[in-house]
Amino acid sequence: MTLSWFHKLVPSKIRTEASTKSTVPEGLWCKCPSCNAILYKSEVERNLEVCPKCSHHMRISARKRLHLFLDPGNRLEIGEGLAPLDPLKFKDSKKYKDRLQQAQKATGEKDALIVVAGQLLGLPVVAGAFNFEFMGGSMGSVVGERFVRGVNHSLEHGAPFVVFSASGGARMQESLLSLFQMAKTSAALGRLSKARIPFISVLTDPTMGGVSASFAMLGDINIAEPGALIGFAGPRVIEQTVREKLPEGFQRSEFLLEHGAVDMIVDRRDLRERIAALLALMTRDGRAVAPAAAKAPPAIGEGAGEADLARCLSALPMDDPEAE
């Protein structure tokens, strides 16, 4: 049945205007997953992917993280040519090889960790960041090798090492090869500690499994972003195992700070200055830090001891382990 009678009644001009597509481009707006506010995308980006309404810290890619953290220019990517293999020919519901190709196509990266040597407010550093969009930021052999090469670069140049973790844990598709990386990365940090080169671990949402059980909690200073999920097994798994209801906010960074599992919580917008100030104290090189960041950072939360930590670090003779 045709609608010719309708076309006779409705002028063509009206029909044309009604069918005209909207000229508003896509991607102008986004929704905060915490407060559900509809936000202007460019405003969120200017705010470093932090919700301007509720200060929820959204997840960001590894490259964007490093772009925001390091000074522009003079950057060297470490282990860029490394790519994962499939020696076990692993297959679950999908072949591991196919999962890798899918993740690489979606993210444009070869694996989940990017390590870059650069500067932070003029202070030489080596920084690594996980991309959670790449197979949940899982740690496989390439992630472990890039991490160790980053440590080696720090040892060679005497530069502090900073890592932003965002991972679901060890990569099951690499089986024992992925579990080896827990020991491999931890042993590398032992060499860094012996050389008295600072390692700062920044735990972002989420940091779980084999990553939290290895290098992520081995920082000389462990920093968490607000509201980050941090732990080994997920809260639902724990509740099913112990058959008890977990406390409110269990495994969130605020809960961990209250119970001494992390040293401080720092807003993403303050991370550059805060970490630079701490590294200046730990390396005795305050000249490398901008004047605004050279002073001891303020305390956070209710009675948190970050200012006390900064004063202790500045007063402690770094070569005298017996000093109090």
From Swiss-Prot:
| Stretches assigned to the CoA carboxyltransferase N-terminal domain | 28-297
Please state the residue ranges covered by C4-type zinc fingers. 32-54
List the GO biological process terms. fatty acid biosynthetic process; malonyl-CoA biosynthetic process
Check the record and name the PROSITE patterns matching this protein.
COA_CT_NTER (PS50980)
* Cofactor: how bound: Binds 1 zinc ion per subunit.
Top-level class of the enzyme under EC nomenclature: transferase
Question: What are the subcellular locations of this protein?
Answer: Cytoplasm
The pathway to which it is assigned is: Lipid metabolism; malonyl-CoA biosynthesis; malonyl-CoA from acetyl-CoA: step 1/1
Instruction: Name the coenzymes or cofactors required.
Output: Zn(2+)
The record's keywords, sorted A to Z, are: ATP-binding, Cytoplasm, Fatty acid biosynthesis, Fatty acid metabolism, Lipid biosynthesis, Lipid metabolism, Metal-binding, Nucleotide-binding, Transferase, Zinc, Zinc-finger
Assembly mode: Acetyl-CoA carboxylase is a heterohexamer composed of biotin carboxyl carrier protein (AccB), biotin carboxylase (AccC) and two subunits each of ACCase subunit alpha (AccA) and ACCase subunit beta (AccD).
Q: Tell me, in a sentence or two, what this protein's role is.
A: Component of the acetyl coenzyme A carboxylase (ACC) complex. Biotin carboxylase (BC) catalyzes the carboxylation of biotin on its carrier protein (BCCP) and then the CO(2) group is transferred by the transcarboxylase to acetyl-CoA to form malonyl-CoA.
What is the protein's name according to its record?
A: Acetyl-coenzyme A carboxylase carboxyl transferase subunit beta
UniProt source species? Methylococcus capsulatus (strain ATCC 33009 / NCIMB 11132 / Bath)
In the UniProt record, the gene name given for this protein reads accD
